[in-house]
Amino acid sequence: MPRSRALILGVLALTTMLSLCGGEDDIEADHVGTYGISVYQSPGDIGQYTFEFDGDELFYVDLDKKETVWMLPEFGQLASFDPQGGLQNIAVVKHNLGVLTKRSNSTPATNEAPQATVFPKSPVLLGQPNTLICFVDNIFPPVINITWLRNSKSVADGVYETSFFVNRDYSFHKLSYLTFIPSDDDIYDCKVEHWGLEEPVLKHWEPEIPAPMSELTETVVCALGLSVGLVGIVVGTIFIIQGLRSGGTSRHPGPL
């Protein structure tokens, strides 16, 4: 990716508005909804309009298809959102972006180096379907490529990626999911490309399979188990004999 590429974010306008109204730290509430997060950037004409609740995405507006996409279909049965509202907000942000670009003399945004972590959704069992999660944080500007590799080859099937989520410092984070079946023959990498990185970053993951016991270890374990069993038999026999003896001496002849 060309790092010299000029990029001014429409989110800067959003940042200004949020700063005037008070930061997220000023809010004291059991639940927080973040409505109408609008991001537009150029060149590339890339935008995003999302709604979040307690840090989780409720829906986003597909700007190409001009429709609302709910994260869970059930949400769409309980509420509705006209995608035209999101498209209008994006149009406003796009206009503001043009104004800011001229005022800044097309100054590029500062690129931050993102950080990535890979982990499984559930405890890993070989042969059992699971999901790998690549969590990428500290993204700015919100332009990034996340690619899954299996045995160094790109994987496209079973991949799902979220929208960008806004952090408190106005950087972003994003998650990429890969459904897979764990095998001791496969290794996986999450490849992250961003303007803040001098070269792509690979986060490696492979299933942790316990090493097989050696013959000596198996022999020691068997011998230990046998010894414990024999000790138990001996101790049990002693207790039985003592019980019989104490029972015999406690008997006294009754009256004639």
From Swiss-Prot:
Signal peptide boundaries: 1-23
Any one cellular-component term (Gene Ontology): plasma membrane
Family annotation (SUPFAM superfamilies): Immunoglobulin, MHC antigen-recognition domain
Pfam families: C1-set, MHC_II_alpha
Region annotation Alpha-2: where it falls in the sequence: 112-205
Membrane topology: Single-pass type I membrane protein
Chief location category: membrane
Subcellular location: Membrane
Keywords, ordered alphabetically: Adaptive immunity, Disulfide bond, Glycoprotein, Immunity, Membrane, MHC II, Signal, Transmembrane, Transmembrane helix
GO biological process, one term: positive regulation of T cell differentiation
Stretches for region Connecting peptide: 206-218
Regions of this protein lying in the Extracellular compartment: 24-218
Molecular-function annotations in GO: peptide antigen binding
Cytoplasmic side: 245-256
Region (Alpha-1): 24-111
Family: Belongs to the MHC class II family.
Protein name per Swiss-Prot or TrEMBL: H-2 class II histocompatibility antigen, A-B alpha chain
Native species: Mus musculus (Mouse)
